[in-house]
């Protein structure tokens, strides 16, 4: 398969959370173009079945292939847990997820071998973070906690709100009691609540946000495949954004967290794919 190295990277998530990954790609791979898709009509993914998540992921990848992307980042932990293996087998394009990079950092950082994971019901229920961590270091004890209200709170824009603080305190108490020294933010929405989580967990707990590590993993993949952009193609709009619903709301949120002025977000009918 002949892939154009100046083609964009496809990035997708259930909503706005994957923007934390897109942001790190922008910062660390500035020559790369991005096509981002947020499945805002069907968020959250965390409560959906594995079969449904695989179907959604296939639809989105078909759409991204239509945009002629050269590689795809599944910037969603639930889709990475449930769909990554299936779509890698099915599509002839390099695809990475966000779970392995985070697990590798957590295994390297923990001192007391007690690692916490927070994520959606689907991600936590899959046990995939624990599986990766145990492969890396069998002596690690893993404590997982589903935090299903975090995604709706982020999508609502309640990043600094007393309600969010109260919800976070209730969710995280269990992990505080387990004395974890490292906490994986196992959903790409959760870094947007980092300051709240930090306040509750304290300064001594290492918070692992896989977005940065995922950008580095993407960089390694592109180099390995000979697909890194040489930055010779100038483009007035290097970053394009698509959603399945609520385009204006998405655009406003994206502009609040990205180091780039998002001028247009286009709504598409993802069910066609």
List the model feature ranges, each with a label:
Residues 1-273:
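Non-catalytic structural scaffold of enzyme domains
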């Amino acid at each position: 398969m002949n892939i154009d190295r100046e083609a964009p990277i496809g990035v997708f998530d259930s909503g706005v959370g994957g923007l934390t990954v897109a942001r790190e790609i922008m910062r660390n791979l500035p020559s790369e173009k991005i096509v981002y898709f947020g499945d805002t009509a069907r968020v959250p993914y965390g409560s959906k079945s594995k079969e449904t998540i695989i179907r959604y992921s296939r639809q989105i990848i078909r759409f991204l292939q239509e945009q002629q992307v050269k590689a795809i980042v599944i910037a969603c932990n639930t889709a990475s847990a449930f769909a990554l293996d299936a779509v890698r087998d099915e599509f002839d394009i390099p695809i990475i997820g966000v779970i392995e990079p985070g697990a590798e950092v957590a295994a390297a950082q923990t001192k007391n071998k007690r690692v916490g994971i927070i994520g959606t019901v689907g991600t936590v229920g899959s046990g995939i973070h624990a599986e990766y961590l145990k492969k890396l270091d069998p002596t690690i004890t893993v404590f997982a906690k589903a935090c299903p209200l975090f995604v709706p709170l982020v999508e609502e824009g309640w990043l600094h709100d007393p309600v969010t603080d109260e919800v976070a305190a209730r969710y995280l108490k269990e992990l505080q009691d387990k004395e974890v020294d490292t906490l994986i933010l196992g959903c790409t929405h959760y870094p947007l609540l980092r300051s709240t989580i930090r306040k509750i967990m304290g300064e001594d707990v290492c918070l692992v946000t896989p977005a940065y590590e995922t950008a580095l993993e993407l960089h390694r993949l592109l180099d390995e495949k000979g697909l890194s952009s040489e930055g010779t193609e100038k483009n007035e709009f290097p970053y394009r954004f698509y959603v399945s619903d609520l385009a204006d709301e998405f655009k406003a949120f994206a502009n609040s967290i990205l180091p780039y002025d998002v001028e247009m977000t286009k709504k598409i009918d993802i069910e066609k794919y």
